Amino acid sequence: MGEDGFVTPPRREETLGLLLGFLGVAIFAATLPLTRLAVGSLSPQFLTTGRAVIAGLLAIPVLAIGRRAPPWRDFPRLALAALCLVVGFPGFSGLAMRGLPAAHASVIIGALPLATAAAGALIDGDRPSPGFWICAVAGSALVVAFALHSGGGALQAEDALLLAAVASAAVGYTLSAQLSRRMPARDVISWIVLLALPVTAPLSFLWRPENAASVPGSAWACLAYLGAMSAYLGFFAWNAGLARGGVARVSQAQLAQPFLSLGLAAWLLGERIDAETGLCAVAVVSLVFVGRRFRAGSAGRQISGASPAQALPLRRT
């Protein structure tokens, strides 16, 4: 048994789990840069609903092949998770990305693991140590200070939207973690996006571009990636990695995400990463790392009878 309460996986399984975990992180790291690229041609509303429609359509054959019965007793929790993960996070971040560089946004979103752990304490009954809370408060203060400094002493509306996106994702991941103790994690994300489909499909039609032919192919490619990978299939690699390598070990892979996002922002968007942004990203990731160390004893908590494969990651979008 490992310190996180799970059976320690064989080294080969652990290595495979880490590789899958890094694959999931790499998939998610492109979310903000591609959103920034797409909102130049597609509205945030269409981008939010369109990616959800793509994910929902992909979920139909997955659930049909598995012959999964609708989890009616979990409908309220699934609906709230869908509100947070299908509408809240992509909607708020999409609106924010109209006026913020992807590099700037990557620093703020880098605090998501701490926010998710805090949501787990408030909603799911986790009891992190005082050291974790110190890191959480310090990380939050650092993110707010970075936003204030970048905004000339005032919090920009886009920064407030990003903070709302972080809060939405944190609550959504916590609710998903609760649901994952009752059903496989892939079914949780599948039901979440499928449940939202009757709402997102007509809204995406309503908010579609007036002249779709004038939208560049790069914007459509970004939408396809966000829907298929960021909103759906990315969770498959991430969840499989957690199941094989252990939650406490593989979850450390997400520490690389802000740096991958910064690199993609520079490569895809030509954004200049100044020393201030880079140093702040390092500081936020360091606080996340230390905070996770403090809460290692409770990070792998699970209900009796639930397997590691059913534990949803404390991570996105």
Segments from the language model and where they lie:
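Transmembrane alpha-helices of multi-pass small-molecule transport proteins
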Residues: 2, 17, 41-88, 113-119, ...
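Membrane-interface helix-cap regions at the ends of transmembrane helices
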Residues: 30, 34-37, 41, 55-72, ...
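Structural signature of hydrophobic alpha-helical transmembrane segments
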Residues: 40-55, 94-112, 156-168, 217-231
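Hydrophobic transmembrane alpha-helices of multi-pass small-molecule transport proteins
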Residues: 59, 79, 111, 119, ...
